[in-house]
């Protein structure tokens, strides 16, 4: 055996078949081009193919195929595939692409397995106390894995997302004014969809009522705000999987930026803020506007409610605390350099003395029911503030503390590279999303960024949601959902 035969990774039979395939392709190409376009070269090309076959092919039977007249009517040529070589070539390219895709999928699955093994190790350290076998402490310490469990696509950019408090359903609002409900275990098509507004939905909130009066049936309420200056209130009919509109709230004179719905005893109220610089309080049951006040000199971007108090963030870069039943402004926070996109109260949670900001530092704050709040801004920072105690008087509305009416910034979180759009707090973690296309998880105890999800969306990340940890009517689940400008919503589940 010669040296070149040793280098060739083919048996004699395989080499013979390869040579025949090459000659057949040359023969086919000669018949298609030379015979019709270069007739003068017909004989010379055909002679070259015959000569080459005699050189490459040892068996006379194999050579006879090319010595014959190459007529397609020849019976010996009927079962011969002259294009076998280019077909194999194309198949190899497709297989290489498929192999690359499979390798990428394998890397993804290996990463998910590692994340799951880590979660199993963490679960083994805690005693199960919940119905699903997971300790409540561990649920609040959950950090989503690197890749989402499912991906939901809609027709336009996602402006707001909310998880159903009890069921595996996510509600998605879009820039085209559409409202969707998706089953997280079968998300190929929505459970329900509704053109709820004529312009973009800017905000959404949900509440599962908890009436103590047995004559009233509890159900899920969904409130949406829009650029069409309207607020719509819907009931989610679980039996029929549909949105049932209850009423519309009209009164704002410009874009409605945000809405919140909450229940105190058997009373349900809705708060809204607008570019008309006002905040309005509405009675859910009759739709009446109970209170209107103007806490800022510019566009009010965001609000949050805790009992009788509302915190608001504005285009004027400040956040303010207001006692909404009286309309009294109590305190103000200054420190952001650009408009504030989101504000939230930090609720106290029981039996968590090791978590910073989640327990009151004094009995006065404990009796008041709040102490800290958080704001996210276009200046790329997230700030946590201590709220000064107002002057509280029996049977009278609170008034500003004459000696201390300014928020005190106790922690600033830096890491985002663009506007911070939304925030959510669970346990000792704060989750944030921004226009830098990333989602971040921060440790409230240390102020450090623990994890960054950088490739969830191809555009701005507009919103996110997790189950709250302070409502006894809501069992926190290990779930997180995000929505972005790329018309996608990512869902993370344990």
From Swiss-Prot:
Q: Look up keyword Nucleus and say if it applies.
A: yes
Instruction: Spell out the residue ranges that the record assigns to WD repeats.
Output: 153-192, 196-244, 251-292, 295-334, 347-395, 415-454, 457-492
What the entry lists under Pfam families is as follows: WD40 (PF00400)
Q: Where is the LisH domain?
A: 14-46
Question: What does the UniProt entry say about where the protein is found?
Answer: Cytoplasm, Cytoskeleton; Cytoplasm, Cytoskeleton, Spindle pole; Nucleus
What does the UniProt function comment say about this protein? Positively regulates the activity of the minus-end directed microtubule motor protein dynein. Plays a central role in positioning the mitotic spindle at the bud neck during cell division. Targets cytoplasmic dynein to microtubule plus ends, thereby promoting dynein-mediated microtubule sliding along the bud cortex and consequently the movement of the mitotic spindle to the bud neck. Following plus end binding, dynein may be offloaded to the cortex by NUM1. Required for viability in the absence of the kinesin-related microtubule-dependent motor protein CIN8.
Record comment regarding domains: Dimerization mediated by the LisH domain may be required to activate dynein.
Which PANTHER family has this protein been placed in?
F-BOX AND WD REPEAT DOMAIN CONTAINING 7 (PTHR19848:SF8), WD40 REPEAT PROTEIN (PTHR19848)
Q: Which family does it belong to?
A: Belongs to the WD repeat LIS1/nudF family.
State the name under which the record lists this protein: Nuclear distribution protein PAC1
Q: Could you tell me which species this protein originates from?
A: Saccharomyces cerevisiae (strain ATCC 204508 / S288c) (Baker's yeast)
Gene this chain is encoded by: PAC1
